[in-house]
Regions:
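Surface-exposed acidic, glycine-flexible loop patches that form ligand/cofactor-binding
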Residues: 47-52, 89-92, 154-166
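Active-site cradle of extracellular carbohydrate-active enzymes
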Residues: 170
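VWA/integrin I-like adhesion module and closely mimicked acidic/polar interface patches used
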Residues: 173
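Acidic, polar low-complexity linker/tail segments
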Residues: 2-59, 66-73, 77, 85
Length: 173
């Protein structure tokens, strides 16, 4: 994963095709998608490639509980394009490899953590639409925000750190 580059025209074609559709029509999963299930995942890797010789891992963990579940929809339809084009235009980091995580409630939800691959191109959009928007949570103020941090610490590997001694970035929304 992590080869290719982001095509804003293809992304905006996706957003145009989803305009006016209900969130449930785009996010049709009613259980965790096998490609997003962290169970049994040893590593998710962000590696340098010919297209991205200085890959920088960037993880965006999104709260998908009932009170915040709309964020995944907004990020897929609007925020992803802004994120990628802003990074590519301003260049605060080199060769971004983006991973999305969906965060729920480990006490109440069936899918408290979902993880994409690291992607440098539009494949991230397809993975985003596979997210199971459980809209759960227990109202117990116990969303599992530590789960993405744990996964990133123990189940990711990236050339940015191994070759250049630079850490990646993780944002929890």
């Amino acid at each position: 994963m992590g080869s290719g580059s982001f095509d804003s025209h293809a992304y905006f074609s996706f957003t145009s095709s989803t305009a006016g559709k209900a969130t449930d029509d785009i996010y049709a999963s009613r259980t965790i998608h096998k490609d997003l299930d962290p169970k049994g995942v040893k590593l998710r890797e962000s590696r340098d490639s010919a297209d991205n010789p200085n890959a920088t891992p960037l993880i965006v963990a999104i709260d998908v509980t009932g009170s915040m579940g709309i964020l995944a929809d907004v990020i897929a339809r609007e925020g992803l394009g802004v994120l990628f084009t802003s990074i590519l235009d301003r260049k605060p980091i080199s060769d971004p490899h983006v991973m999305f995580m969906a965060v729920g409630d480990a006490n109440c939800d069936r899918a408290p953590l979902q993880i994409s691959q690291f992607e440098a191109d539009n494949r991230i959009v397809e993975q985003l639409t596979q997210i199971y928007l459980e809209h759960g949570g227990g109202g117990n103020n116990f969303e599992s925000y530590n789960a993405p941090w744990y996964f990133a610490s123990f189940h990711t590997a990236h050339d940015s750190m191994e070759k250049r001694g630079k850490r990646g970035y993780l944002f929890t929304v």
